[in-house]
Amino acid sequence: MKIMLYTNKMVSGGAERVIANLANYLSQENEVILMTYIKGKSFYELDKKIKFYSCLNKEITKKRFDNIIALKNIYSIVKSESPDIILSFLETPNLHMLLLKKILKVPLIISVRNDPSQIFNTRLKKLTLKYLYKRADGLVLQTKEAKEYFNETIQKKSVIIPNPVNPKFLKEPYCGQREKKIVSVGRLVNQKQQDVLIDAFEIVNKEYNDYKLVIYGEGELRNKLQEKINDIGLNEKISLPGNVANIENEIYKYSMFVLSSKYEGMPNSLMEAMALGIPSISTDCPCGGPKFLIDNNKNGILVKVNDKKEMAKAMKKIIQDSKFANFIAKNASERLKELEPGKINKIWQNFILEIYSKNNRR
C-alpha cells in the first residue's frame, strides 16, 4: 500500500515525534510519503525509504495566499504519487485535505491532536467543522472527551488512539536520593500556563526554599515569564534553559514533574515524566488527556486548572511524603508501559486498513 502523511512541519514537538514514529513503522511494509505544508527538514530521523515533500518553498508562512499555493502543490503531488490513502495531522493540514477531498478522490483519515473546543473556537471554524469534517473517511482522536465533542455522524467514523510513549523514557524509577528540583517541559505559550506554575512554586518556596524550578522549552512568552520571575525575586530559584537534547537524562533524578496547562490533547511531556518514574502532577484539563493517564493519588496527582494553591499543596505533598512519592512514581512507570510504540502503531495500522478496505468496497 502507498500511504501519504501530511502535517505542518517536522520540527521538535510531540505531534511531530508521533508522526515520524508512525511513518517509520508503516514504511517497513508500505511505500510511505511524508509531506509538510512548510519547508524544512525533519527534526526526527526518518527511514531512507520515505519520500519527503514540502508544499511551500519557505520556512515561515503568514500570508493567506500561501494556502492557495499549498493547495495547488498538494493537488500536483497527490496526483503524481497516487497514494492509496492519506493521513493528515493538525488543523491547517486537515483543512487543506478536506477542501481537496472531493477532487482528489483518495481515502482520507484526519487526526485532531488537541482539545477540539479550543480548535473550533470561532464561528468560521465551527462552520468548517459542520460542513467539511464529514468529508473525512476516518477521524483519529486522543481521548473519549475529544470524541464526544463531535456529532454522531463524525463519531461513527472515529477511533481513539492515544500517543505512544517515546521508548527512550521507559525506565525503572530512580531509587536514590532525588535532586531538589521541580521540572516542567513545554512550549512557553499561553496554553501551558507556566505563570500559574511559577505562582505555585512561589508558595512552595516560602516553606521549602531549598528547591528549584526548571521550566524547559521555548516560545513567545519567554521574556514575559522571565520578567515575572525577576519581579518576584526568584531568578536564582527558577530557570528557563530552553530546549535540550536527551532531556530524559537531565530530569531522571528530579523530585517531581508538573504540567500546568489549561487544555491538552495527550500530553507527551507528562507521559514521558511518568514513564521515567518521576512523581507527576497535572491539571485535570480538557480534553481529558491527563485524566486518561493519571489515576488520582494512585500514579500521579490531578489538580484544578488555574488553581495555584491546589497545585502548591500537591507539590508540598510530594516533598513531605517520600513514601507516597515513590508509590505514585512506580505506578506511573507501569502505566506508561501500556503505551509502548509497537502497540499504538498496530492500532493505527488496523484503522488505516479498515478505512482503505471500506473505500475499496464502494
What are these regions (language model features)?
Residues Q226, K237, E310, K317, ...:
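A short, well-ordered alpha-helix in the C-terminal region of glycosyltransferases
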Residues P279-D284:
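Short hydrophobic beta-strand element within catalytic cores of glycosyltransferases
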Residues D295-N297, I301-K308, K317-S322:
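Conserved acidic donor-binding segment of nucleotide-sugar-dependent glycosyltransferases
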Residues L5-N21, Y25-D66, N151, L221:
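N-terminal strand-loop element at the rim of the active site
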Residues E16-N21, L95, K180, S184-K206, ...:
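A conserved mid-protein helix/loop that constitutes part of the nucleotide-sugar donor-binding site
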Residues N243, K262:
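Aromatic "clamp/platform" in nucleotide-sugar-dependent glycosyltransferases that forms part
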Residues K39, S88-N94, V112:
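Short His-centered aromatic/hydrophobic patch
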Residues E145, P164:
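Carbohydrate-associated surface elements
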